[in-house]
Amino acid sequence: MVHLRRTLAPAWWPIPRKKGGVWVVRPSPGPHSLAYSLPLALIIRDVLKYAKTMHEARYIISRGYVKVDGVVRRDYKFPVGLMDVIEIVPTGEVYRVVPDADKYYNLLPISTEEAALKLLRVEGKTMVKGGRIQLHFHDGRNLITTLEAGKQIKTFDSVLYDLRNKAIKAHIPLKLGVNAVVIHGSNVGFSGTLYEIVWTLKRKQSVVALKKGDEVRRTILNYVMAVGSEGPVIKISP
């Protein structure tokens, strides 16, 4: 389907529910799921306000004026999600999609120096020919690495990825003491030090606790992303 009923769209989408018609653009199949992505056209029209109508938003995108992770995207339905880097070519403005307590996901202005950097969470690993390991990331990206490097990087760890050179710049293990941020659920946007993990049979459902000052928030392991050893390795908050 090309469209989605407004009333069925994810609650965090910045669209009116009872105005603007019955339908809204549905994200095309891609790197992020419907629940955790926003169509590129809605970002241009409803978030950044570069367009007043869907027709104008589609025109801007079709002209190649918008890049996602350094690649020109001409599909107005392209799904944009967590940690994606959006660049408006004519103005040079660059934004990162970050978890936010109020908006669920928000666009954070970043410098052009950071435009080539992206945090990726490892969702799984597989062995491939030649005794190498392929890493699977949260944005659908895959990367083949050596057996030695692949063994060190665990599922749910994060890596700092160089979009231009297509290479890992840093490895951030998800372990006690690491700085992490909640990326889904009711505590989305909360960041702090990971100070407790209660393991369960289903690893994704293990309970973790993040602490920031005197405040403690608990969520499940699947909702947490490591962002740095002592602090975020890139800008993820204002």
UniProtKB/Swiss-Prot annotation:
GO terms for molecular function: RNA binding; rRNA binding; structural constituent of ribosome. Residues 38-101 form the S4 RNA-binding domain. Keywords: Ribonucleoprotein, Ribosomal protein, RNA-binding, rRNA-binding. SMART domains: S4. The keyword Nucleotide-binding does not apply. One of its GO terms (cellular component) is cytosolic small ribosomal subunit. It holds the Pfam family RS4NT. Transmembrane segments: none annotated. One of its GO terms (biological process) is translation. The keyword Ribonucleoprotein applies. Belongs to the eukaryotic ribosomal protein eS4 family. This is Small ribosomal subunit protein eS4. The gene is rps4e.
